[in-house]
UniProtKB/Swiss-Prot annotation:
The keyword Repressor does not apply. NCBIfam families: lpxK (TIGR00682). Keywords: ATP-binding, Kinase, Lipid A biosynthesis, Lipid biosynthesis, Lipid metabolism, Nucleotide-binding, Transferase. The keyword Transferase applies. The lineage of its organism: Bacteria, Pseudomonadati, Acidobacteriota, Terriglobia, Terriglobales. ATP binds at residues 40-47. Transfers the gamma-phosphate of ATP to the 4'-position of a tetraacyldisaccharide 1-phosphate intermediate (termed DS-1-P) to form tetraacyldisaccharide 1,4'-bis-phosphate (lipid IVA). Belongs to the LpxK family. This is Tetraacyldisaccharide 4'-kinase.
Length: 322
């Protein structure tokens, strides 16, 4: 193992051991907590899965909120995400979630609360809205907040990764022993992992292309996500062959200089239009009009045996309430 990864791993192991032995304390909220997280840095579909889980909960008329750190935002204070806010204020993914749930349930949408201290964010939510189910965004390594159910999303290459800072792993693969369920596409080979929780939920991954986007268009595709190659592959799978591709770092907030770079690429590649992700459209902000025509692609997940999976979570809720 690389010395830097070994040093990082030693720190992670020490911290986990302190939680396991109760030398570091977990704080518990009044409402049950379901964590949605991963082993690697970014790119496993946590936001689409949280949307999917939210849809299932709303179908069962279960009240919930989402607690998120709000990665990349300018403040650390606790805030309820407002639909007319910006990624700089709330973080791109919390804002995306808030808008998604508001569109699904306009009359009384699930709230998304951001805060660096997610226990305090949860307390704030309970004081404001009463105890309810909390979905903890990116929570697997956030062990300071006690949870009742840990869901970990896996990517196809997770089993081949090494620890940070050389690789993408936040902690060793054996950390999966803490999880209650993993979520994976059929590409993920479960037997490649040294340990596995009892529940393995399979999902089907797909993208939704705008109807007005012609498959014959000369498309410039760009994105700022953790695994851009998956986005470009998805486009090709749906019959779109980009004439040019541009990538930016995950959660990137686009500047005027970035737009000029994209415009130059449009000209040199003779592209008819741009295609990007829903998250990138949000991070483009008011600059988006300079790239017209531009189309946004939404990633979606479909959970097989969704009712059975949700029943497992409901058992946890009922256990806490009983």
């Amino acid at each position: 193992m690389n010395p830097l990864s070994a040093l990082f791993g030693a720190g992670v192991a020490t911290r986990n051991a302190m939680f396991d032995r109760s030398l570091l304390k977990q704080q518990r909220l009044r409402g049950p907590v379901v964590s949605v997280g991963n082993l690697c840095v970014g790119g496993t579909g946590k936001t689409p899965f949280t949307q999917l889980l939210g849809d299932l909960l709303m179908q069962r008329e279960i009240d919930f909120d989402v607690l998120s750190r709000g990665y990349g935002r300018e403040s650390t204070e606790i805030k309820i995400v407002e639909l007319d806010g910006s990624p700089n204020e709330f973080g791109d993914e919390p804002l995306l979630l808030a808008k998604y749930f508001a569109a699904k349930k306009p009359e009384n949408p699930p709230r998304v609360i951001v805060g660096a201290d997610r226990y305090e964010a949860g307390r704030f939510a309970e004081q404001k809205f009463g105890p309810r189910l909390h979905l903890l965004d990116d929570g697997f390594q956030h062990r300071g907040l006690a949870r009742d159910f840990d869901i970990v999303l896996l990517a196809p290459d997770d089993a081949d990764q090494v620890l940070l800072p050389v690789g993408r792993l936040r902690e060793p693969l054996t950390a999966l022993k803490r999880a209650h369920a993993v979520v994976a596409t059929d590409e993920v080979k479960i037997e490649a992992f040294p340990v596995m929780p009892p529940l393995v939920w399979r999902v089907e991954r797909d993208i939704a292309l705008p109807e007005q986007l012609s498959r014959n268009a000369r498309v410039l595709a760009f994105c700022a996500i953790a695994r851009p190659h998956r986005f470009f592959t998805d486009l090709r799978r749906h019959g779109l062959e980009p004439v040019a591709e541009l990538t930016f770092r995950d959660h990137h907030r686009y500047s005027a200089a970035d737009i000029e770079k994209i415009v130059r690429e449009i000209s040199s590649s003779r592209a008819d239009c741009c295609v990007t992700t829903i998250k990138d459209m949000m991070n483009l902000g008011e600059l988006v009009h300079r790239l017209a025509p531009i189309y946004a692609v939404r990633l979606s997940l479909k959970l097989r045996d969704a009712d059975a999976a949700l029943d497992e979570i409901i058992k946890i809720i009922e256990r806490r309430q009983g």
